[in-house]
């Protein structure tokens, strides 16, 4: 379906064998299960300082990837409708190097869930959250090995921009004084849905007008992105359509648990990650 691996990424960290990626994913899943058991009868941790640094780090990494992907694809003369794997020379290598950081960032983002476990936010560890985190890390191992440049650049470019907004929101939410300015969290989920639709459209444009990019990869990516559209749309409907916030009600009314001035039912699921406000 995918053909031989791309020799240009041979020897890159974590890419030569699938075993490390698979093993780290299993460790991630076991950490959720065992961590919840360990924390069951223990007090939740605050992690305020760690979360501040973590969110800042992911925001800066996302900003680097966004800028570098835009510059490298522009200088490589990338075609927005369809870009093959080997026509931009050094530009393709530059894109591949950024996409390796994108793959590695998906490993780092496993910490999103670990922080939920340590803070006993078990209601936030949903199927959407775990599915998205675990699958992205594994899928991007495949992308880097078979299609590390060309058409693959578009989704990470959009996602890096979304992550700048998302982790900036998380970083600001650590500070109670900033909560009054965080009215825009609902729009992060909307932005993600737009991102998925744009990525699917961009992917299928290479099916309509082929340029030599592997057909099987295009179909697989479109199918995977559709699962995210379905899951995120379901989350959006359940959270913002069926359970609207009633501004006239006092805090704690209608049985809603209020954390830091925000009803728990009004959290977001940006990139599969729901609200990470510090108690």
UniProtKB/Swiss-Prot annotation:
The chain crosses the membrane at residues 12-32, 50-70, 98-118, 136-156, 158-178, 188-208, 213-233. GO terms for molecular function: acyltransferase activity, transferring groups other than amino-acyl groups; fatty acid elongase activity. Its EC number is 2.3.1.199. Pathway: Lipid metabolism; polyunsaturated fatty acid biosynthesis. GO terms for cellular component: endoplasmic reticulum; endoplasmic reticulum membrane. Keywords: Endoplasmic reticulum, Fatty acid biosynthesis, Fatty acid metabolism, Lipid biosynthesis, Lipid metabolism, Membrane, Transferase, Transmembrane, Transmembrane helix. It holds the Pfam family ELO. Its main location: endoplasmic reticulum. It catalyses: a very-long-chain acyl-CoA + malonyl-CoA + H(+) = a very-long-chain 3-oxoacyl-CoA + CO2 + CoA; (7Z,10Z,13Z,16Z,19Z)-docosapentaenoyl-CoA + malonyl-CoA + H(+) = (9Z,12Z,15Z,18Z,21Z)-3-oxotetracosapentaenoyl-CoA + CO2 + CoA; (5Z,8Z,11Z,14Z,17Z)-eicosapentaenoyl-CoA + malonyl-CoA + H(+) = 3-oxo-(7Z,10Z,13Z,16Z,19Z)-docosapentaenoyl-CoA + CO2 + CoA; (5Z,8Z,11Z,14Z)-eicosatetraenoyl-CoA + malonyl-CoA + H(+) = (7Z,10Z,13Z,16Z)-3-oxodocosatetraenoyl-CoA + CO2 + CoA. The keyword Nuclease does not apply. A motif (Di-lysine motif) lies at residues 276-279. It is a multi-pass membrane protein. Belongs to the ELO family. ELOVL2 subfamily. The C-terminal di-lysine motif may confer endoplasmic reticulum localization. HAMAP family: VLCF_elongase_2. Interacts with TECR. This is Very long chain fatty acid elongase 2. It comes from Rattus norvegicus. The lineage of its organism: Eukaryota, Metazoa, Chordata, Craniata, Vertebrata.
């Amino acid at each position: 379906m995918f053909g031989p691996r791309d020799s240009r990424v041979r020897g890159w960290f974590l890419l030569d064998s699938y075993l490390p990626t698979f093993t780290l994913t299993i460790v991630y899943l076991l950490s959720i299960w065992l961590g919840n058991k360990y924390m069951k009868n223990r007090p939740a941790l605050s992690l305020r300082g760690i979360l501040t640094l973590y969110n800042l780090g992911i925001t800066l990494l996302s900003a680097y990837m966004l800028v570098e992907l835009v510059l490298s694809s522009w200088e490589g003369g990338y075609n927005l409708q369809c870009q093959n794997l080997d026509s931009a020379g050094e530009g393709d290598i530059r894109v591949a190097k950024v996409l390796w950081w994108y793959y590695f960032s998906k490993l780092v983002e496993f910490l999103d869930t670990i922080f939920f476990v340590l803070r006993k936010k078990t209601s936030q560890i949903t199927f959407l959250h775990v599915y998205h985190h675990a699958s992205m890390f594994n899928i991007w191992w495949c992308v880097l090995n078979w299609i590390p440049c060309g058409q693959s650049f578009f989704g990470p470019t959009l996602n890096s921009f979304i992550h700048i907004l998302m982790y900036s929101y998380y970083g600001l939410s650590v500070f109670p004084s900033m909560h009054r300015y965080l009215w825009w969290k609902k729009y992060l989920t909307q932005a993600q849905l737009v991102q998925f639709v744009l990525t699917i459209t961009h992917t299928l444009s290479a099916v309509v007008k082929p340029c030599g990019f592997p057909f099987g990869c295009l179909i697989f990516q479109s199918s995977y992105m559709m699962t995210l559209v379905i899951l995120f749309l379901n989350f959006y409907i359940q959270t913002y359509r069926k359970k609207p916030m009633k501004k006239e009600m006092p805090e704690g009314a209608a049985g809603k648990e209020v954390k830091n001035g925000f009803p728990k039912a009004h959290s977001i699921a940006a990139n599969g990650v729901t609200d990470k406000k510090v108690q």
